[in-house]
């Protein structure tokens, strides 16, 4: 057999192998065209999501759409030869329609954590995860040692009664409820360490927290939209100017 003929058969084998690999994708038709609905179903089987008011959520809370777009890009780039970016955005739009959820009632009986879900009833902690609006970037560790440095810091900043008040308030923030209708204001001299509590809130709540100015929320009608689906808003530099009536 000549080298040319052997190379030709090798190329043919490679082409046939590529065709077989392409056929393994249930979201690609016989002509190599991506079927958007089938691809959305394929994506949701490995990555369950829901869509609330044009925002996508999964088991970790609000979806990073840049990361999701890259995942779609990685799947489609070998099949879509032209207008790939347009097709990717069309897929995301189709995904929002496919996962449309008209309403999501606040889950007041559980806290979503990195290593599972903590139920406030007799079930306690379970390692399973589910779709949620927020998942805190911390783990539940029942045998964790006492946070001695944090307790020492609070002891030097607040009186014992105020430490209990702070602890109670932080507990309210763990569930998506405004039933208490309370906000926490800490006043004092500069340099005492009050801002560290704000930093702790950002670390504890992650994407479920939002830094914003109360004055801006009062004067900018678009600012409050950033608070939707958040558990806490932190204003670590409160402006003492009177709010407009």
Report the location of each language-model feature:
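Intein modules and their embedded homing endonuclease domains
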Residues: 13-137
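N-terminal acidic, proline/glycine-rich, low-complexity intrinsically disordered segments
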Residues: 1-14
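Alpha-helical structural motif
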Residues: 35-39, 72, 87, 146-150, ...
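A short, contiguous, amphipathic alpha-helix enriched in charged residues
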Residues: 30-35, 202-207, 242-245
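Generic amphipathic alpha-helical segments used as scaffolds and interaction surfaces in large
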Residues: 30, 34, 63, 82, ...
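Short, flexible active-site loop motifs that bind/organize anionic cofactors or intermediates
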Residues: 2, 17, 239
